[in-house]
């Protein structure tokens, strides 16, 4: 049986999965990866730990399926995270600075005069979330990096580039548009790096990876790692990968990945839309054809459940929240705004901070757990309403994936608060499957995206709205009030 191997490098886990042509998982190996919090608002990872997790998991999957069965490899990854490394030694010059890291707020504030140019050409906002200011921080703050860049020793990449470089034994330094378009350095209209943006962020062009099409031959694995050379034929950022696997119809359907954050995407076609409070981005490029998307990125989604579990010790496992939420009939006025790293779309307030409001003497763990799940659904509605404003099109269905999509209370409440159906696919590993699809189309496993979707997509459950409109709007208006209380908090 021929398989495509997908390498999925997330924020908290690395997964390597072998998929058959019908999308079934033939083999899987995964490892948890740790985060480092050196200071408040800073989030890092050890790039060598990421690579080691990939290397070990890939080795285990290859042992399970056998080298002869492997058609190709695809890569998907957490986006915006930056790594700079010495291309001679392969050693990172600093830890990976993660997407949710806020240390570059001041850098972004000082560059505010360029925000219009940045928005118009990248589709993104001038915000610490994206890669460019993080790269600038490393260049300006880590000893010796500037000189080593001048000597041509140091190169930059997002996580996909770092994994690709290591897989190929340091031979290939490339990326693709779905990742490049998240750096604030890439012009999404011209599909190339923008010299003006490089000047704004003081980043030399010679450290940047070459940009391939998303579905193309990036290179071959080094024999010392995989035993034989295996073609690497597809790369997509994690959210674009899940969008690809959902088979979303343009402008009618939205996908939401319920992960550490919440990532909503709407496919918009062959011309870029530059939205006001959301993000315009590249979905993928296949056979010379570019597809664009609008994205709403919510910084804290499932992470608020992890916080209840790891920091407050209120629950033992994430699944406990479903039972707790269902055990009470309402939130009793308790709202939780989980602005741990500020607020992302559509507010983009880096100075917002988390609050739990409406607490009384009757408030119990059940109310806090329910408020956390409801916050995920409210933030999703915030983004969908903004998408509808930008496009003038009413969204007909939400397609869900990610860990928290397995929570039935959340999915039902999501349908209720939106007033539209929420569809959950049978396949849990949508992000990894999307990377397999983009790779397998180039390597001949599937003839087209349409064939890939037909072979692999299967709906497990559809949640239909049951809540009355008046009740829905009352809940949501209270949420909006709570958000106002959380905004600008660190500036007060």
Curated annotation (Swiss-Prot):
<feature type="binding site">
    <location>
        <position position="239"/>
    </location>
    <ligand>
        <name>glycerol</name>
    </ligand>
</feature>
<feature type="binding site">
    <location>
        <position position="11"/>
    </location>
    <ligand>
        <name>ATP</name>
    </ligand>
</feature>
<dbReference type="GO" id="GO:0019563">
    <property type="term" value="P:glycerol catabolic process"/>
</dbReference>
<dbReference type="GO" id="GO:0006071">
    <property type="term" value="P:glycerol metabolic process"/>
</dbReference>
<feature type="binding site">
    <location>
        <position position="12"/>
    </location>
    <ligand>
        <name>ATP</name>
    </ligand>
</feature>
<feature type="binding site">
    <location>
        <position position="238"/>
    </location>
    <ligand>
        <name>sn-glycerol 3-phosphate</name>
    </ligand>
</feature>
<feature type="binding site">
    <location>
        <position position="403"/>
    </location>
    <ligand>
        <name>ADP</name>
    </ligand>
</feature>
<feature type="binding site">
    <location>
        <position position="407"/>
    </location>
    <ligand>
        <name>ADP</name>
    </ligand>
</feature>
<dbReference type="InterPro" id="IPR005999">
    <property type="entry name" value="Glycerol_kin"/>
</dbReference>
<dbReference type="InterPro" id="IPR018485">
    <property type="entry name" value="FGGY_C"/>
</dbReference>
<dbReference type="Pfam" id="PF02782">
    <property type="entry name" value="FGGY_C"/>
</dbReference>
<keyword id="KW-0808">Transferase</keyword>
<feature type="binding site">
    <location>
        <position position="260"/>
    </location>
    <ligand>
        <name>ADP</name>
    </ligand>
</feature>
<feature type="binding site">
    <location>
        <position position="11"/>
    </location>
    <ligand>
        <name>ADP</name>
    </ligand>
</feature>
<dbReference type="InterPro" id="IPR000577">
    <property type="entry name" value="Carb_kinase_FGGY"/>
</dbReference>
<feature type="binding site">
    <location>
        <position position="260"/>
    </location>
    <ligand>
        <name>ATP</name>
    </ligand>
</feature>
<feature type="binding site">
    <location>
        <position position="79"/>
    </location>
    <ligand>
        <name>sn-glycerol 3-phosphate</name>
    </ligand>
</feature>
<comment type="similarity">
    <text>Belongs to the FGGY kinase family.</text>
</comment>
<feature type="binding site">
    <location>
        <position position="80"/>
    </location>
    <ligand>
        <name>glycerol</name>
    </ligand>
</feature>
<feature type="binding site">
    <location>
        <position position="80"/>
    </location>
    <ligand>
        <name>sn-glycerol 3-phosphate</name>
    </ligand>
</feature>
<keyword id="KW-0547">Nucleotide-binding</keyword>
<protein>
    <recommendedName>
        <fullName>Glycerol kinase</fullName>
        <ecNumber>2.7.1.30</ecNumber>
    </recommendedName>
</protein>
<keyword id="KW-0418">Kinase</keyword>
<comment type="function">
    <text>Key enzyme in the regulation of glycerol uptake and metabolism. Catalyzes the phosphorylation of glycerol to yield sn-glycerol 3-phosphate.</text>
</comment>
<feature type="binding site">
    <location>
        <position position="302"/>
    </location>
    <ligand>
        <name>ADP</name>
    </ligand>
</feature>
<keyword id="KW-0319">Glycerol metabolism</keyword>
<dbReference type="Pfam" id="PF00370">
    <property type="entry name" value="FGGY_N"/>
</dbReference>
<feature type="binding site">
    <location>
        <position position="15"/>
    </location>
    <ligand>
        <name>ADP</name>
    </ligand>
</feature>
<feature type="binding site">
    <location>
        <position position="129"/>
    </location>
    <ligand>
        <name>sn-glycerol 3-phosphate</name>
    </ligand>
</feature>
<feature type="binding site">
    <location>
        <position position="79"/>
    </location>
    <ligand>
        <name>glycerol</name>
    </ligand>
</feature>
<feature type="binding site">
    <location>
        <position position="129"/>
    </location>
    <ligand>
        <name>glycerol</name>
    </ligand>
</feature>
<feature type="binding site">
    <location>
        <position position="403"/>
    </location>
    <ligand>
        <name>ATP</name>
    </ligand>
</feature>
<feature type="binding site">
    <location>
        <position position="238"/>
    </location>
    <ligand>
        <name>glycerol</name>
    </ligand>
</feature>
<dbReference type="GO" id="GO:0005524">
    <property type="term" value="F:ATP binding"/>
</dbReference>
<dbReference type="GO" id="GO:0004370">
    <property type="term" value="F:glycerol kinase activity"/>
</dbReference>
<keyword id="KW-0067">ATP-binding</keyword>
<feature type="binding site">
    <location>
        <position position="11"/>
    </location>
    <ligand>
        <name>sn-glycerol 3-phosphate</name>
    </ligand>
</feature>
<comment type="pathway">
    <text>Polyol metabolism; glycerol degradation via glycerol kinase pathway; sn-glycerol 3-phosphate from glycerol: step 1/1.</text>
</comment>
<dbReference type="GO" id="GO:0006072">
    <property type="term" value="P:glycerol-3-phosphate metabolic process"/>
</dbReference>
<dbReference type="GO" id="GO:0005829">
    <property type="term" value="C:cytosol"/>
</dbReference>
<dbReference type="InterPro" id="IPR018484">
    <property type="entry name" value="FGGY_N"/>
</dbReference>
<dbReference type="InterPro" id="IPR043129">
    <property type="entry name" value="ATPase_NBD"/>
</dbReference>
């Amino acid at each position: 049986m021929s398989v495509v191997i997908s390498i999925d490098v997330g924020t908290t886990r690395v997964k390597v999965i072998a998929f058959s042509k019908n999308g079934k998982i033939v083999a899987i190996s995964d490892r948890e990866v740790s985060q480092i919090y050196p200071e408040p608002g800073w989030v890092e990872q050890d790039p060598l730990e990421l690579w080691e997790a990939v290397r070990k998991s890939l080795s285990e999957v290859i042992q399970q399926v056998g080298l002869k069965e492997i058609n190709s490899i695809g890569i998907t990854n957490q986006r915006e995270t930056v790594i700079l490394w010495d291309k001679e030694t392969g050693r990172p010059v600093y830890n990976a600075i993660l997407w949710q890291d806020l240390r570059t707020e001041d850098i972004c504030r000082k560059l505010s005069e360029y925000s219009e140019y940045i928005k118009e050409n990248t589709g993104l906002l001038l915000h610490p979330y994206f890669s460019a200011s993080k790269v600038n921080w490393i260049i300006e703050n880590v000893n010796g990096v500037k000189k080593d860049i001048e000597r041509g020793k140091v190169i930059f990449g997002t996580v996909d580039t770092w994994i690709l470089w290591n897989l190929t034994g340091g031979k290939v330094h490339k990326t693709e548009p779905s990742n490049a378009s998240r750096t604030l350095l890439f012009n999404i209209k011209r599909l190339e790096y923008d010299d003006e943006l490089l000047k704004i962020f003081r980043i030399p062009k010679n450290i940047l990876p070459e940009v391939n099409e998303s579905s193309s031959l990036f290179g071959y694995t080094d024999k010392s790692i995989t035993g034989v050379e295996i073609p690497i034929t597809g790369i997509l950022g994690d959210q674009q990968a899940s969008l690809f696997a959902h088979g979303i119809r343009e402008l009618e359907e939205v996908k939401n990945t319920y992960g550490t954050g919440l990532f909503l995407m709407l496919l918009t076609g062959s011309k870029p839309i530059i939205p006001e409070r959301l993000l315009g981005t590249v979905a993928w490029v296949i056979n010379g054809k570019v597809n664009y998307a609008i994205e709403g990125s919510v910084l804290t989604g499932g992470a608020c459940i992890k916080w209840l579990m790891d920091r407050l010790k209120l629950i033992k496992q994430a699944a406990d929240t479903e039972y707790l939420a269902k055990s009470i009939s309402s939130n009793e006025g308790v709202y939780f705004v989980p602005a741990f790293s500020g607020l992302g779309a559509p507010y983009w307030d880096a100075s917002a901070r988390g609050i739990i409001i409406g607490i009384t003497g009757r408030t119990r763990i059940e109310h806090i757990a329910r408020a956390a799940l409801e916050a995920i659904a409210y933030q999703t509605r915030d983004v969908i309403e903004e998408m509808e404003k930008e496009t003038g099109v009413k969204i007909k269905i939400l397609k869900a994936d990610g860990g928290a999509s397995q929570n039935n209370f959340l999915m039902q409440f999501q349908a209720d608060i939106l007033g539209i159906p929420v569809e959950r696919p049978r396949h849990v590993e949508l992000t990894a499957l999307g990377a397999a699809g983009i790779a397998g189309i180039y390597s001949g496993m599937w003839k087209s995206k349409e064939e890939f979707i037909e072979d692999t997509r299967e709906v497990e459950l559809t949640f239909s709205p049951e809540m009355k409109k008046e009740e829905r709007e009352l809940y949501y208006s209270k949420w909006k009030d709570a958000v106002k209380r959380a905004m600008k908090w660190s500036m007060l």
